[in-house]
Swiss-Prot record:
This is Chalcone synthase A. Pfam families: Chal_sti_synt_C (PF02797), Chal_sti_synt_N (PF00195). The primary product of this enzyme is 4,2',4',6'-tetrahydroxychalcone (also termed naringenin-chalcone or chalcone) which can under specific conditions spontaneously isomerize into naringenin. GO terms for molecular function: naringenin-chalcone synthase activity. The active site is at 170. It is an enzyme of class 2 (transferase). Pathway: Secondary metabolite biosynthesis; flavonoid biosynthesis. The lineage of its organism: Eukaryota, Viridiplantae, Streptophyta, Embryophyta, Tracheophyta. Keywords: Acyltransferase, Flavonoid biosynthesis, Transferase. CDD domains: CHS_like. One of its GO terms (biological process) is flavonoid biosynthetic process. It comes from the Eukaryota. It comes from Ipomoea purpurea. The gene is CHSA. The keyword Transferase applies. The keyword Plastid does not apply.
Length: 396
């Protein structure tokens, strides 16, 4: 099988110098549900609440998966009380889409609001200056969508230009940065609010002896929302840029569309992930890096800071080994995976927030761990790789 990467959209912007018109991230906010689970005890809870404690071998396998995940805890909307009220969520293959939808259409925008409010507070400008809203989720589908609900929750202008992105997968966080960059740079004076909100209730269900991928989903995904505000030409003294979005591209690995699949069924969103996914991503990341950084004369991957989507520990280990990265390069990605699990579209934005906060705490010279150039990587169904070249700003 060929693994040569094919560029689908967005040729690289060959601009080696900073342009005033380039989009900047002006604020970041994140939020999680108050409820959280300890990964070490989660197998006991999961098999008990799904009435599956008799599946002893399956439970021990799940425990091994959890122990190898390098995840310490995850925040979840799911509680024992919620599951007892809705037992159809706990049985594999039981029709439960209506129940899931009723919960998700409320919880997804609410969590998104919490993240958005934090970003807006950091931004420090009137909410009326938001001109565009992009909302992304893999959790639930509704019309009017979560974007519409969020405009009401935040009190945005009725004239705000909305875009709802459903079912995009784990590459979506990086893809939303690409989209926000395009919107900001083509709408002078525009301020784009991007919100990624994910609730893993869409994939929660009891174990299946026939579908072992389901156990990986139950171990891996967590709930969280992240928001960024993007615009060009920050107002001096009124707006403080955090990162510059320099260029962006999306690629797919040929003949891999069946390797990572999420499908909406009567029992909710099903999950399939081939064991070949980590190695396929690992084999193709460097080609994306070369295309991205060649215009800027950069080929030392340890000279940049990294925002790598932690789809799983195997992906982090594989990329680190393949590229010869120093251990600290993927520290932020590993930390977010450890504390939150895989947050799907919100994950890279959580990592971006972690990087800039730790850079300030450690008294680094820039928001990018003291370095100038960085990369955001998102991986998702397709197999799709989204790559965003970013530039840090000095920390005053």
């Amino acid at each position: 099988m060929s693994t040569t990467v094919t560029v689908l959209t967005d040729t690289w912007s060959h601009r080696a110098k900073r342009l005033e018109g380039d989009a900047k991230i002006l604020a970041i906010g994140t939020a999680t549900p108050a409820n959280w689970v300890d990964q070490t005890t989660y197998p006991d809870f999961y098999f008990r609440i799904t009435n599956s404690e008799h599946l002893l071998e399956h439970k021990e396998k799940f425990r091994r998966i959890c122990n190898k995940s390098k995840i310490m805890k995850r925040h979840l909307v799911i509680t024992e009380e919620l599951l007892k009220k809705n037992p159809n969520l706990c049985t594999y293959n039981e029709a439960s889409l209506n129940t899931r939808q009723d919960i998700l259409v409320s919880e997804v925008p609410k969590l998104g609001k919490d993240a958005a409010m934090k970003a807006i507070k950091e931004w420090g400008r009137p909410i009326s200056e938001i001109t565009h809203l992009v909302f992304c989720t893999t959790s639930g589908v509704d019309m009017p969508g979560a974007d519409f609900q969020l405009t009401k929750l935040l009190g945005l202008n009725s004239s705000v230009k909305r875009l709802m992105m459903y079912q995009q997968g784990c590459n979506a966080g990086a893809a939303m940065l690409r989209l926000a960059k395009d919107l900001a740079e083509n709408n002078k004076g525009g301020r784009v609010l991007v919100v990624c909100s994910e609730v893993m209730l869409s994939v929660f269900r009891g174990p299946s002896l026939q579908q072992e991928d389901n156990l990986l989903a139950q171990c891996l995904f967590g709930d969280g929302a992240a928001a960024v505000i993007v615009g060009t030409e920050p107002r001096p003294g009124l707006e403080t840029p955090l990162f510059e979005l320099v260029s962006a591209a999306q690629t797919t690995i040929p003949d891999t569309d069946s390797y990572l699949k999420l499908q909406l069924r009567e029992m909710g969103l099903t999950f399939h992930c081939s064991k070949a996914v980590p190695s396929l991503i690992t084999q193709n990341v460097e080609d994306c890096l070369v295309k991205a950084f060649e215009p800027f004369g950069i080929s030392d991957w340890n000279s940049i800071f990294w925002i790598l989507h932690p789809g799983g520990n195997a992906i982090l280990d594989g990329v680190e080994e393949k590229l010869g990265l120093e251990p600290e390069k993927l520290r932020a990605s590993r930390d977010v995976l450890s504390q939150y699990g895989n947050l799907t579209s919100a994950c890279v934005l959580f990592i971006l927030d972690e990087v800039r906060k730790k850079s300030k705490k450690d008294e680094q010279m820039t928001t990018g761990e003291g370095l100038e150039w960085g990369v955001v990587f998102g991986f998702g169904p397709g197999l799709t790789i989204d790559t965003v070249v970013i530039r840090s700003v000095p920390i005053n």
